[in-house]
Amino acid sequence: LAKGVEKDSLYTMSEIIRDVLGNQAKIVALSGPTHAEEVVRDMPSTIVSACDDLEVAEKVQNLFQDTCMRVYTNIDVRGVELCGALKNIIALAAGISHGLNYGDNTRAALITRGLSEMTRLGTTMGCLEQTFHGLAGIGDLIVTATSVHSRNFKCGTLIGQGYNVDDATKEVGMVVEGLNALPAAMQLAKRYDVEMPITAMVDAIVKGKVSPNEAVKALMNRDRKTELTKSVADISFENSIIKSKRGLGMKRVITYGT
């Protein structure tokens, strides 16, 4: 099992495999909110089978689908893989907020705005927005940023409590994937000119450039933003077109901002 983004090539795991085996290789990415501790106890779980060949994704879907595991298909392999890497960084941020004794409001804000960062980067790289709003995106993010099983959340909590990164990692006792994902995430953000303030602050904390408290202040004191990427006039115009064509009343068209 492997996931993440290689920091030198910035390839996802499937892209590395394809680079070795060639374009004829049929590669499936499995991802979603599936902590092993619950899967082995046959607790109902859901996952995504992603392949650019839908028939292959469906074959894997049929292999894994049973009464305790529901499998959905997706053709956005890169998007699914990016979700699996980036959500660990946001989980670190959520853990840091927990270690600072902040509450549910703060964690909800980090999850929501963290998802916005993930989506911005992914769509700029050609991934599907729906992928980030599905099981591999928000689904896995919620689990990783809230669960007691999450190594990333636990490591973040320790950092928020004052541990340095090395000691926090040793205390967790396993690989903390969010730490490994940070270099590639920062490089991708720079390459595609995408603003990722939460990711950048986690990176600064890990590198010892700012304290967790300083990072919180920096995030809260950023320039004021709108939650929408489209202007109110554009949204109103689109809604009026939808209304006139369908005659079904106003349907809101909303997209995520920075």
Question: Where are each of the predicted segments found?
Answer:
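Short beta-strand segments
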Residues: 1, 28-31, 48-50, 93, ...
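Rossmann-like NAD(P)(H) cofactor-binding subdomain of soluble oxidoreductases
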Residues: 1-44, 60
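Internal alpha-helical scaffold of NAD(P)-dependent oxidoreductase catalytic cores
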Residues: 16-24, 44-131
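Conserved hydrophobic helix-helix packing surfaces used for dimerization/oligomerization
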Residues: 47, 252-253
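Conserved N-terminal Rossmann-fold NAD(P)-binding element of oxidoreductases
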Residues: 256-257
